[in-house]
Amino acid sequence: MQLPPSTASSETHLEYTSHFQGAGEAWKDAEIITTEQRAAIQEVSALVQARADALRARLSASEQAAEATSRARARFGVRDVVLDLRVMACSDGLLNGPAQRSRSHELYRSVMLGRTASEITETRPRQQPELVQRMRTQLADAPDFAAKAPLLADLDEALQKSFGARGALDDAEAAENQASDAEIAARLELRRTLEQAYGKLRAAFPGQRDFVESFFPRRKARRSGEEGEAEKKRNEG
């Protein structure tokens, strides 16, 4: 019996179960099979089918979770761009207002936390919302000027959406990890079931190794040219 490598994908494992089920269906229709043997084939086929169905469900859930994470990551990326724009707008509002075009102005340095706007926007996306939140607090405590209220409103909206998008991404990544773990567990359970099925078939059909082996696909042997190429790559590595 040959099972796929333990590191093989769920899709590869399911290909093995498709072969197993195809062989089972063919043997059940074979005229040389007795009623008792047909019942044994039916039993192991049902076991394998149940585990295969479970893995398919877990695989589907894992793929959906990965897609959800990708969408959540894209949304958070968009919110990072928007937050950057709000930071730049705040910097411009200060420079065109009370800071009088000077980044060395005390108010500018206070609101911008002693940084330039670019230094803030270049912060890692996951860390930036807290930094901008501190900046927003400094702006709120600053003396009033014409652009202060709209700048605060824009920062508040951008921060709220950035925090929300980051939280949604965290939730999506956690769900993806959970789905991936469940898929791996289902795949391992399917491998164990295939091994058990092999043992049950050997017990039900003693001395008929070829018959039992027909339920499992055989890995194709490499042609000599392929083997030579593989050896060449190993030597080059």
Model-found features: residue ranges?
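Basic/polar low-complexity intrinsically disordered segments
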Residues: 1-237
